[in-house]
Curated annotation (Swiss-Prot):
The keyword Transmembrane helix applies. Residues 369-383 have a biased composition (Basic and acidic residues). Its main location: membrane. It comes from Drosophila melanogaster (Fruit fly). Residues 28-43 have a biased composition (Gly residues). This is Sodium-dependent transporter bedraggled. It is a multi-pass membrane protein. It is found in: Membrane. Residues 1-62, 221-284, 363-473, 1086-1136, 1169-1238, 1256-1275 are annotated as: Disordered. Signal peptide: none annotated.
Amino acid sequence: MSSKEQQAAGRDFKRNSNAYSSLPPTGTGAGCSGAALGSGTGTGKRARSKQHQLEHEQFGLSNSLSSESIRQACAYYDDELSDEDLIEIQQTPQAFHQQTKQPLQLQPISFRLGDELGDERSAFCGSQEMQQVPLSTPIKQAAETDEALCVLSELDAILDVHDVSQLNGTCSSGSVNSGSDDDKVEDYLMDLDNYLEEMDNALNREDSLIIIDGHTSLKREPRTRTLPLSRKKKSSKKKSEDQEAAQGDFQREHQLRKTFSCSLRPTSQIASSSGSLETSTEPVMDVWRRQSMRRALEQEDTKATVAMEREEDDIPTLLVELPPRRDAEMRRCFSQGDCQASVAPTVGSQMLTEAHIFDNLLQTNARASSEEPRPRQYGRRLEGPPTPVRPLILAQSRPQSAPTRVQMREPQLQDTPTHPIMSTCSELSSARSSRMPSPVSLPSDSSSSGSSSAEHDQEPDPVQTTTMCSASSTTPLEPLHQLQLLLREKCGFNSQWPHAGSRTLALIGCTLGVFNMCRFAVLTINFGGNFLLQFLLLSVIFGIPLLWLQMCLGAKIRAGPVSMWKISPICAGVGIALVMQQCFLALYSTVSLAWILVYLRDVFPTAARSGYRWQEMAFPYRYDASNATGNLTQTVAEYFNVVVLQRLHLANHPDASGIRFHVNDRQLAFYLALIWAAVFLILCKGLKSLGKLAYIIYTLPLVALAVVTAKFVYVVDPSRIQNIFAASDFDDFLVNSNSWTAATQETFLTWGLLGASVIAITSRSHTNANKAALRRDAILLVLFTLIGLGLMALLALCCAQILWQHGYVYVPGSFENPDCYTSIYSLQSNTNPYLLSYPRSLIPHYSSFIGETYRRNRTMIHVESGFQALRFISEIFPAVLSLASDSISWVWAAVAFATFAGFGLAQLCVMWKPISSALGNSTSSVLLSCVTGLLLSIPFATEMGISILYYVDFLLGGSWFIPIIWTAQIFGVFLIRGRPYNGDDLVNDLRLCGSMSAFLALSWNVLLPIGLITLSVVDYKASLSNQFYYWRGKSYFTYWSRKMGSLIQIGVLLVIPVTAIIQIYRYLAHGPPDILERIQLLYRPPEEGEEPRRPSARQTASQSRRNALGQTTEGGQHDAQNDAPPKYTPPPSYTTATGARLAKLLRQSIRRSVRRVLGDSSRTRPVLSLDAESASPAAPPDYLTILTNPAGSSFNADPSPASSSSPESIEIDQRPVGYSQRSQSLGRKLHRSGASTLERRPYTAEDVVTILRSSVRHRQSQGGGNLVTASTLPRPPTAAMSTHLEDASFRSIENLVLNAEPPDRTPGVELELELEAGQAEECARNNTSVI
């Protein structure tokens, strides 16, 4: 070869060596070009690398590529296609799943991307035998034009037209070509390069595409622009041969234009070396894999959501297998990661001219502009081999023969820590089914799709996995998993409990506080053992089930007492009323804790006194000088009223002011501030701080109570312990109404009063909590509560025995004046027999939250209320400590009062927790709530604070309207909302035994509503609350206070209906266009992640029925009418016809409304399920497929073998006559096994026609032969059908029509009946109609 030829060969494609990868040349041209290059060098080093260059030149356009290799690489053939070839082209996707290997065939290329960044991003080639598909189609008939096809075709045309003689020369020819021809070829190649750059600019604007076999979503990376035309003619610096040998494939730092090709069969000249050719392709392809994947990772957009797929078994890769043809090659072009395939058809002697290219581009643009967008496709409409559909892909992007790919928009980034996994199914919708949107999609089996994700039964991940099976779907799917919804909440404050036992200890504060412990102690002293047994019995029947119901609601709904009514917004007023009532309880009960701190302060001895302060005289001038110590009967009562309550006006003290609403001593205000500061420190970090301190504020008081009780038992004379229950008269167990009233009220105040806090506490759990955690908490809470109350009852009985030993007796007093607030009397000094001998068990009693009311003198109820707060701490316990000071030191007294203060602080924290959470989940909201609570509790620390305390406690503390609110909650949850929050479902969360679960369900549904209403009546009578509503008679309260009290009690109850009215206005004024949808959102909104019913489904079904009626009328004109004409019937009058029609419309409207409101699942249409490709799809409605003809014989339409083999035919099997899915009340269903329905496809419109036609009336033919006709609408059932079959038939027909897929969405159903030969064509023509 001359030097000029060598220079021309060196200039060929040298400037584009970094922008092109090559096509494999066939024949000897490639080898000769390499030999010529090797001979031109003349050095031994080039001779050693000669063979290495030959191997690489088989795969790439090297710097020294000869004209013959270009000719062989760009060769194309145009064979005329036969009819068989065209059929095979259409059936090419059916061969995607075949995987038989051909030994001498190179492998088509597919991609599989790794999940992790650290994994090797590999692309592999697989060879699989498939059906024969022609490699080319005529240009004007091609559906789409590939980018790589256009590039190679233009290159081929330019080379053939302008330098045919030069390209046809071999490497051994010694002819000398002119320099002008070489320059001309180079100029055309540079023009082609500019054309490719313009194509790159257009392709860069395309959206990112997802490869079907890939695991990640990669955006299209732009190519690096080549040099300008002025600089392209400058020759680049020549690299050394060592660098060419080491870097003969690709350079890593450049954006490459990759054009890769593999030959299915080598030409005859190199057929003997096919084995070595296969071997030589592997290293080059391996390097190409690494570089392309690295380049894709570098250009990946960080804002794009990385789609992660669940771990699946080996899914067959979709590969296109092309048959081997002699002297034919297949070009596979990969443009920046997109899988595209294309071939260019020509005849062997015909050249591709510029006119052909221009015409082809015009046709492509016309097709792209005329292509209409297609809406989203729900579900799958075609079983069998996947059919490629490209509604959103450009016309030039890929050929028909390439594997199907899916184009989708980038999903928006979620705010949650985890993202839903988008799994793209390989089974796509057909072109016919993508035209119209479908509001209803029936679940279908995925047994025919080997790559469907429904074939893999896997446990659900914490991150929601959604399956997307539509090629044109661009709507992001919503995650459904409950754990992902929980992760959206603010973490670190009220998200979860820090320890496993924190929730259990916090729940103890709801049932075990200083107030109910003091009440329980005093009631045990007054009523004895009868009260204990009655309380235990009522707790088992009513109290404990009520507590467990609140725990189950909190754990099930996972929301607070107000936000829990997202399940039924119309009942939100119930939660607001409960929180309001509990807020008032927390405000006025705080001052009682300040009283305990005053007692704790005065326990410690000082230098001025050696004993307790309540042993000294409060006012020495009131007593004789001889009585220095004073009477214990007076000192204990005066200490509480004067020193603790600061009621200085009672003793005419000089420091007393004329204004009773005055803070005489600021000690109570200081203790109130100290208490609220402690509450803030405990709740400042939400559940995190409360859970950590729960082990201190709940455990230590309980342990200290046990220690103090043991000490008092030790002090009591052992011989008198056996007489503790001797005073109890068990004969009055059933007849003493006062005892039963006290036990009933105490049961509710202990187990149900603070239910709002129970719901708020149980709505959160520990991170590692299992399903049995709720049962553990429920059982431990009951045990700890009963133990605490039992210890307190034992302590109270010991104190009563100590008083009896020292000659004192306890008689409940009243707080009003010194004459009545004394409660400890000495048997020696007091001689009033009426006061000492009156049995305490017969005194009328009423319990409120912080105190009790005993009406000793019924004639003076308008003067003495009989109320006293914390009777055990303010009346009994200080007197016992004074009498037993020799055996019980002040240390034990300090421990006892500290224990009571700890119980009170713990209960105040759990009461204030839902109130502070209502303002917000932050430290500032807790601080704001605590400061507000401090300011609102200051009035109770004034001189008249005890009077205000009694008034508020009488109105709100355990009043008659509180049980009514809890009754409304039970009705709202069980009746208005219903499933899945009824008793049968909630009781399963406790995981108790069968008998206990049945009893709880019975108690929640029947016993609790009855018991709460009865308790409301009992409270109303026992508390004398009628004085608030009868303003004429005498009363303890003033006229204005009675009006205010009635307004407060009724106002709390009116919160429920007022909130319901507001919610009705909000939901009916705004929302979905369908009024029934709005009503459903108001009463029974769908759960989070559950799609509401679609009103468009009913409209579509109605439209389908109207279409069916119209088509039936047209088709009925051709049917033979053999029946005799009916007898004459006079037409109805206008009034009768109009009234009947209106009555029918009204009846149908009421039925639809009731079904929508009650959620009757027997009439519910199946809606689109986001997990339609899940492993266990829901079974379609049970349709009746056995229909009977007038003769009474069973008619079964079995497809013929020809139709059954077609993928567009179905098989209608015979089912049992019994209707196995009959609806029950309140939406319940008899569950049936779906084994017979899970293996069949959903019914389409054509299926419905076929099934309904199987119930036709067989009419006799006219004029020879029997004519069997089919009617679209079924006739009413005859008398021969049974009643059961008659009822099931109409229900099945209605379900068939309502649940059928819309027409024109799936291929028609071909059902060939067993007809006579003369009527086969007519039957087939009738079966093509749609409803």
